Amino acid sequence: MILYQVFSVLSLLITIYSFALIIYIFMSWVPSTRETAVGRFLASICEPYLEPFRKIIPPIAMLDISPIVAILVLRFATTGLWGLYRMIAF
């Protein structure tokens, strides 16, 4: 029971972080939103995660697709997390 709760909380945190990334991406489309307090906070938690993806994946025709790949990696991490739970619990 406690194991399920731990995995549920981890999954929820990954989901919340995914939404933070999406909000941060949309904020990049609106000028000067990254200079706000919310923008700086999101930059401080999102940029360290996005930086390795940006080093590996170059922009394609002025379009940065690395955040999309980063979000997909988080989705795969959630799926892997629940797979690990199934292996441990059953």
Curated annotation (Swiss-Prot):
It is a multi-pass membrane protein. InterPro entries: CCB3/YggT. The gene is ylmG. The keyword Magnesium does not apply. Keywords: Cell membrane, Membrane, Transmembrane, Transmembrane helix. Its main location: membrane. This is Uncharacterized membrane protein YlmG. It holds the Pfam family YGGT. It is found in: Cell membrane. It comes from the Bacteria. It comes from Bacillus subtilis (strain 168).
